[in-house]
């Protein structure tokens, strides 16, 4: 039997797909993160509910760009400095293809806010400038509304502890999920109608 959290997470996914994206039958769906790291593996349950909701709404195909922030930290610690002016173009290809086809893109904004704290600011700046330069052809589609797109959030320990510093990490994450669900009316009997 599903827990209350699992039921709320499922309603959140359905809300994102049906209302946020207004996914149409036959569209493909790409789920990604706003950062180049990809969607954190810890959000697999949410991704599963999103995929199910998308297919039930008539999605032709659902794809996810997964990632691992710790791998990026390892890069900052050990990669050659001149490598930060490089960015793999395949990370542009997928979202650009979806955007050009008029498909749907769901972005899960849940990056650790302190991930790059303590890193060389010049490297961070070079890295961010490179990412924005490469990703610009895709970003233009979002600002010109040529595709269905939506940004949602998901609770992560870093953000949870910033918003709820007093309780332990697990309780802070639970509080952040509760807040996200309340803000999106997931706590209502019918969040889609709310």
Regions found by a protein language model. Name each.
Residues 1-194:
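Active-site bordering "gate/hinge" segments
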């Amino acid at each position: 039997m599903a827990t209350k959290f699992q039921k709320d997470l499922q309603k959140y996914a359905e809300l994102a797909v049906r209302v946020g994206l207004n996914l149409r039958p036959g569209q493909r769906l790409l789920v990604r993160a706003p950062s180049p790291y990809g969607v954190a593996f810890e959000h697999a349950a949410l991704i599963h509910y999103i995929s199910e909701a998308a297919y039930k709404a008539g999605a032709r195909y659902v794809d996810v760009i997964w990632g691992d922030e710790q791998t990026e930290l390892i890069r900052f610690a050990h990669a050659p400095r001149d490598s930060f002016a490089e960015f793999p173009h395949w990370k542009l290809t997928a979202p650009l293809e979806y955007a050009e086809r008029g498909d749907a893109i769901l972005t899960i904004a849940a990056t650790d806010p302190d991930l790059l704290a303590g890193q060389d600011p010049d490297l961070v700046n070079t890295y961010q400038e490179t990412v924005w330069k490469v990703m610009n052809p895709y970003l233009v589609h979002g600002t010109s509304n040529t595709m269905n797109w939506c940004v949602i959030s998901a609770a992560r320990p870093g953000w949870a502890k910033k918003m709820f510093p007093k309780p332990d990490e697990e309780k802070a994450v639970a509080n952040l999920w509760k807040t996200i669900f309340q803000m999106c009316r997931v706590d209502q009997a019918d969040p889609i109608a709310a």
